[in-house]
Amino acid sequence: MDDMKFSRRRRAWGAMMRTLMMVCAALTCALAAFLILYVLAKGVPHLSWQLLSTKPSYLDDTIGILPDIISTVCMVLATLLVVLPLGVCAAVYLTEYAANKKMVAVIEYAAETLSGIPSIIYGLVGQMFFCQFLGMKKSLIAGAMTLVIMNLPTIMRTTQESLKTVPQSYREGAFGLGAGKWRTIRTVVLPGCVDGVITGCILAVGRILGETAALLYTAGFAHTLYGGLRETLESSGATLSVALYVYAKEQGEFEGAFAIAAILMVLALLIDLAATLTGRYFKKRRSL
């Protein structure tokens, strides 16, 4: 009799927890869907070729985000150009070369700590060091260097964890064939962890696109088209996320702000999709 009561109580408890989890999952999906649909509904009607292909004109009272798109592309490329080699090389050293495990643990802890620091602190430090101490002033290159520091832990840790998934037998097989340490890393280990590098790169791009606070301190918020690449990097410029803040907060241009928000929302969805498909592709290729 007691066993029957316990069994009924356990089934009731299981059903209740299952229902609770379903409600939580449905609520999460509903909130995400509402946010995405609301932003798209508010922003897509205001998207136009004129908005995407012109610069803002205060005399004509028109909004254009072409300078912001160019600044965003330059910011992403400049950041990745520096942070990818640094992060991958640091991960390779910590995983394949470093013999002092205590030092590795300290560096890993420091990287995880850096990942949790608010971005506005990075912006303040970047302004003091890059803009003032190094004399870069507010510029895209100063913002990119600040984002390098912000995203370095992400690239390093994702690459490091991916390196650890490469079986030790692969390394031993390469050594047995007479390959040296660096040749083994270059031809066997790194190709085996390319999914981690790509995933870290995609995550970094997502963070760069969404960053605002740090760039307000270091890159500024100018909406200006410049002649050459060097002039663009050495001048102040607003990325799309910074432009969204400026239009919504400073100028009250909510139509332009929602249009930019819709663009960023689509980019975020595409980045998440790319990360998911990349992970599935390399997982399937490893299983072959």
Question: Where are the language model's segments positioned?
Answer:
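Transmembrane alpha-helical segments of polytopic membrane transport and secretion proteins
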Residues: M1-A25, A275-L288
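Periplasmic/extracellular loop-to-transmembrane helix junction in inner-membrane transport proteins
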Residues: D2-L20, L37-T79, V246-E255
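Amphipathic cytosolic juxtamembrane alpha-helices at the membrane-cytosol interface
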Residues: G14, L86, A99-M103, P167-T199
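Interhelical loop and adjacent transmembrane-helix boundary motif
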Residues: P56-L59, I63, L215-M265
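Transmembrane-helix boundary motif in ABC transporter permease subunits
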Residues: T79-A111, L124, A275-K284
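C-terminal transmembrane helix and the adjacent membrane-cytosol boundary/short C-terminal tail
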Residues: L94, Q160, K164, I202, ...
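Generic hydrophobic transmembrane alpha-helix motif, especially the helices
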Residues: E112-V148
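Transmembrane alpha-helices
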Residues: T159, K181-A219
